[in-house]
Amino acid sequence: IVPTVVGDHIEYSIGHDPQGAPSAGTIAGGKGRCLACESLVENKYIRRQATSKGLGQQLIAIVAEGDRRREYLEPTQVQSDVVVGIERPADVPTQAVPARNHDVDRLPMYGMPTWGDAFTARQLVALTTFSDLVGEARERALRDALSTGMAEGERLEEAGAGATAYADAVATYLALGVSRLTDYNSSICSWSSSRETVRNVFSRQAIPMTWDFLESNPFSKSTGNFLGQIDWVSQSVKGSSTSFAGFVEQSDATVAKYVDVVVSTDPPYYDNIGYSDLSDFFYVWLRRSLKGIHPRLLSTVLVPKEEELVANPYRHGGRDGARCFFEDGFERVFARARRNANPDYPMTVYYAFKQAETTADGRTSTGWATILGAMIRSGWTITATWPMRSERGGRMTSVGTNALASSIVLVLRPRPEDAPIIDRRGLMR
């Protein structure tokens, strides 16, 4: 895409000569560069403008499905007018984005204080429509089930197994499809040059600011379409075992019952991911579609956060407070599991090790040391470790970042009460 300054505005054209391609981007080193006058503008000024007056949008190119390849087209004035002329729906998510969490703070920083602001008007029209249709689909599924003679029964949330629960299940799966659709239909989506397709929001485990974003067509056959998301959900259902009944219980891990169970856990990685704040991106849409079907599960306006076992400095009064909260909670979880542990069955713990988690002098990070220390103090013995290459090296998360490189499976068994103690010097001997 080649920008050209024309009078007081900038026009964009599709170039085919690599020699004429722009040599660099316009945002780097905390500054933005004006294409017209080459002036540098501080990021803090751009953010002030974004929060006070908002950022504009301009359609600069259209990607079409061609004969076994992508076609890149310059938008007409009519097409550009359609984009800016769409009216934003009234009933959109208005829940606030946490402004102090670095995983999501780019949104309010650039004039998007609510979760609904992360989407264009056209995307909001599509998502609210799909979301509302979930309820209509449930009513149709209920009528169809009742017409076959199936008993009405209890709701799905009450462990029902009749027509009502069936309709609730259909609606739940459809809502999960809509939830997946948001990942490919927001103003945070970017363009993958290598695959020539839209890149989803969570290609990284954080929400960045995207200056040149993509709007995918939910009715197309390309990446990000709605039926593709439904297919992912259906494949997951097909892959689930139907030989045994599964039971899921959501509870605080520090007080959960670990009796007659085998524990295998993938715990939070200290401060690496702000799970609950990031989950709000999907939760606001799931709640819109399913709060009448799962009222207890979706009773809160946003994802509950206070008990989340993550070392979050802004939620626990700084780094020291976050470390103490995580260390204390982690130790209580493992002590609770140790209380009724069966020595015949080991506990397995997955830990994703960062590429730069070990420094040049061999010291490990706070997260790794905290987790190991909590396990040992809780009465466990680490009897084996198995490395697993669980992350794809070329994925977006790993390119130029301190990404999670591999997983280590720790095998734990209860340490006998009369186990002897040895110091480091004795161990080295």
Where are the model-predicted features located?
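Short beta-strand segments at enzyme active-site cores
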Residues: Y345-Y351
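Nucleic-acid endo/exonuclease domains
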Residues: D320-D328
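A short glycine-rich, Lys/Arg-flanked "PGG" loop and its adjoining helix->strand segment in the class I
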Residues: E327-Y345, G373-R377
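Nucleic-acid modification enzymes, centered on SAM-dependent nucleic-acid methyltransferases
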Residues: I1-V262, P268, N272-R319, V333, ...
